[in-house]
Amino acid sequence: MVTFEVFRNEVLSAMNSKPKKWRDGQFVFNYIDEKYGVARSVQFIDGVDCFYVDSKIEEFIARSYEYIKNAELSDNY
């Protein structure tokens, strides 16, 4: 299990490869959705949507991490 800071840095570093026409939040949403599959849970269950609202990126990353961490913990039991 990676730490939150490692996860956050991974996502933010990946933004260096985002398409120029994409907003940061759009990239973060798609990156997390493609790599971890939790973006729609954060968007629809938690109501945090960085796809359209870039100011929600940090909260979106934090909530995504919680879903990933909880999934990994439940896989270990």
Segments and roles (model prediction):
Residues K20-A62:
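Acidic, low-complexity, intrinsically disordered interaction modules
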Residues E72-D75:
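Low-complexity intrinsically disordered segments
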